[in-house]
Amino acid sequence: MTEVAGRPGTSGGLALRAGQFVFAAASICAMASAPGFTNYTAFCYLVASMGLQALWSLGLGCLDYYALTLRRDLQQALLMSLFVVGDCVTAILSFAAACSAAGVVVLFERDAYLCRRDPQLPCGRFEVAAAFAFLCWTFSAASALVMSWLLASL
């Protein structure tokens, strides 16, 4: 089997999953702490996408931990195919959500100047949530690339 950093069942794979989960949860918390985020579709989509990402990465993180403790090999063709599809789907959804939320934040701050006009609008929290979503996406994209590489090498 190919020795790639971040493959499932290793500490590198567990670290990738932990990073995905932590940044997805941080993005959800930052957005949920912003009053009125439900008035904007892009922010609701960000919360939904990060929720899916958090569940996916938590599940696979538990599987990685299980494989590490019992010294199991997770590099089987069927499992790898499932990991590739799941990682690619969640990476695409995370990127789309992060971009849409960041686009709305830029619109509010730089184009429409809504953040200056309405000091009650929690633009800083919106920014932080979008930034955490992009960080989550970097871990998710790295994991998707590793899984694709491993599936191609089987």
UniProtKB/Swiss-Prot annotation:
Membrane topology, Cytoplasmic segments: 1-17, 64-87, 152-154
Residue intervals annotated with topology Extracellular: 39-42, 109-130
Single GO cellular component term: membrane
Tagged with keyword Aminoacyl-tRNA synthetase: no
Glycan attachment positions: N39
Subcellular location: Cell membrane
Pfam families reported for this sequence: CASP_dom
Superkingdom as given in the UniProt entry: Eukaryota
Residue stretches spanning the membrane: 18-38, 43-63, 88-108, 131-151
Membrane topology: Multi-pass membrane protein
Keywords attached to this entry: Cell membrane, Glycoprotein, Membrane, Transmembrane, Transmembrane helix
Assembly and binders: Homodimer and heterodimers.
Family note: Belongs to the Casparian strip membrane proteins (CASP) family.
UniProt-recorded name of the protein: CASP-like protein 5B1
Organism: Zea mays (Maize)
